[in-house]
Structure formats: structure tokens, C-alpha cells
């Protein structure tokens, strides 16, 4: 019996370091937390799809800014100090901090911005450097959202764009250009922190904006309920890029399936952990975009959705 106990002890002692060595260590940087981010579970599911089991063959070192963007640089440096095999950053609000923190550790990002225009990489087909991942945008998405809004409410002549200046995207500028073509005045509503939302909506109401287009960012997504509540209070239509917004009361949304795209980020993680170089892995881009229309919201604002537009919708919320 004693021999058996000693043998078991020897097996545990010898194999424990091997098990630890077999684990890939992946840092994760979030704008919120695993509990508050509505899409982080999709990334975890993507890892599971590829055979990764947390605690067995992969260890996730997660750091979340809890909605406080000023914490991101310190958290990024903390993750780099852990010397993980790779770091995953969820969100365009987050990616610049991790890029600034390391130029050697491989980074995979999921961002709703153009990585080239934002200065994250040199090109989508061949990023170069230590960053690759998925981008959730294409060049004409902002223009199409405004176009769909005009088809739904042709009389609209004033809209505002709610955006985060710390999120280096170009949705406001693209909407501004589209507005000039469609005869719509476009107002800028910059929101640097959560406390600015009330003031932004008051400014929109004072300018008699008839609709607000919510630019894509983690900051906006994590504060979706507050934004939809403010829109209802001021009776201003909302338009955004992700289906959950329409489900929460926005008039319409147009964009890719956010969870599916983020889930696919795990493929890049897997390839890099198996030896691929991030700079040689092309950025993935969505090829399918969903139009979701909320008929309840349309009726509440006295709008009739044209049959031609309803027929093109991927989902209609009755």
C-alpha cells in the first residue's frame, strides 16, 4: 500500500510540471469584465470549438477595465509583464492600449474599426508586426445605415452620431459624407465617459435631431440600456450596427453577426499558438451583413416600413 502511495505521489510530482508546460497562456484585455461584456462568451466558445479547455490546455489571464478606459494602459502593461504566449484584445477601444504595451508578444484583436486607418497594422492582407485578428466593418456600412433610415423615414433631415473619440473609427466622418449626399444634416455627439451620455442626448434634443446613429464600440455596447432609455425619454430614433440594439428598441440595425465574428477570432489564436506568425495572418472581414428592423418602434413613432425594405430585412421584430 505504501509502495502504491509513493508511486502515485511520484506520478503527480512528475506529471504536474508537464501539464503546466502544456498549457498555453493567453492574456485577455476587456473594456468591461467577463460578466458585463455581452460577447466574451463567444470568444470562449470559439476556443472550445477548437478543443481548448480552460485549466487543462489553456490558461486565460483576464484583465477587465470595468468600463473605465483610463485603466486600460496599466492593465495592458500588467498583461505584458505576465509574458503570455499571446494576448487577445476585444474591442477597438482596447486594442490601442495593448499595441502600445508590446511589439513582440503576438496579439489577436476583434475590432469594429479599420485596423489600417487606425494605425494598428500596415495592411489587412499582410498585417506585418505582431497584430492580426478580425475587423467587423466594411467601407460603406455607415452610409447604408443612414440610407436605410431615410428609406424608413424619408422626411428625416437631422441626425446625430453618438461616438467615442477614444475609439479610432471613422463612422462619424463616413456618415457626414453620406448625409451630404442624402440631404441630411449630421451632428457630432462625442462621449468620452459614461457621465457624458445625458449631456449628449440633451444636445441632440436641443438641435432637434430626429435620430441618433450609435457608432460601434465597446463603450456604447456596454451602456446599451442607458442609451436606449435616454432615446425613449427624448423620443429620438436609434440606429446602430448590431442586432441586439434593434432588439432593445432601436428602429433598425445593420451589420455583421457580432457573436459569430468574435467566435471566429479563436481561429487566429489557435494558429498562432501552433506556430503561425501574426504578421503573416490576414485580417478576417465579415461577408454577410444583417438588416434587423423593429416594427414596434416604427409604430410607436408613427412610421410605416416600406414593403420593399421589410422584404430585404433578415429579421423583423413584431
Regions found by a protein language model. Give the residues of each.
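Short hydrophobic alpha-helices and adjacent helix-cap/hinge residues
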Residues: 1-318
